[in-house]
Amino acid sequence: LWVLPVDEQLRPAGPAELLIGRGEDPRALVLGDRLLVFYCVIDRDEADAVAGSTMMLAEFALADGRPTLLQAFGLPKNPLQLAAAGDRGAVWEKNWVPFEISPTQVGLIYSHDPWHVIALDCDPARDARRFVGHFPGPSLSWRHGHIRGGTPPLPYGDDQLITFFHASAVVGSRKVYAVGACCFDRAAPYTPRAITREPLLLAPYNSGAHRFGWPFAGSVVFPLGAQH
């Protein structure tokens, strides 16, 4: 995972630097004077076969805008002890979406359908990180696919947060991805309140990715982030 300085128009403004040597699907959150990066790593068994994925948290100190690694560790799999369903089994964890609850606590959208938010204690005065709350709510089902992940939420009005998610549905011979948005209460229990009925973005069916040697025959679009 790399970091790249950008200007006000989000254009590259300097060289890229390696931040984390192994990982994918990062979501970053500034919490006080720290940068928290939630990401996943692919697990492999003794035969080097894919055996799921693990969510990771890397904490960085921010000094003069430059991150210095403090610690990085794996987060528990299936923290809510949910029954395995689809790719949300006990061995697969990814796409947790972080947002600030307080200077020492982070909320994590664990899933949209069913809706689950987990509170994580990130007090810098304590070395250990632990889950300190669980807030289920009404499921957000979407006819354009099963919702996964999303951008770290931003304020929407006085009392809500908004996040832009991605979803996928099988169309013909491939998965087609779409982007939507949902709003939920800023305060506990973080109840979801609204969702876009139609996609804000829809990936083209013929993406042309095969031209670049990418074997995945999917039509993919992901929201990377949102600027307030």
Model-derived regions, located:
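Beta-propeller and closely related beta-sheet repeat lectin domains
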Residues: 22-27, 94-97, 149-152, 222-226
